[in-house]
Amino acid sequence: NIEHSTQSMVSKVKEFEKRNKEEFSRLSNLESQVIEDVLKLIKENKMQEIGRKMNQNQEYLENIGISNKELTNMIKIGQELSFGVKITGSGGGGCIFALTNESNLQNILKKFKDENYECFSAKIDFKGLNTF
């Protein structure tokens, strides 16, 4: 429940780009590769590798300043028991998601709850929307 403004986060990214053109370009290219890799990994159902790509993405976001102290703490907790963890949304609030397997699910939920974070589990639907 962290108050934030998506607009302020977008401004933060634009400011980073303005001050660090080469680094922003490098990170953008790396991110494009992460996206391509994840699309392949999803088709192959390779959860651990997807988790590693999530962690890479999170590093890139942190490099451009899309995080805060609370998110950083949540990320550290999630990394202990998951394949990967990253912020979701614009990055200024307090929302992340972690990718784990069934055997670690209850442990990771407990860890977050012990730290007084709201959390819930969701399953990935690989089938997607199915019509007749």
Feature roles, as predicted:
Residues 1-86, 97-132:
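C-terminal nucleotide
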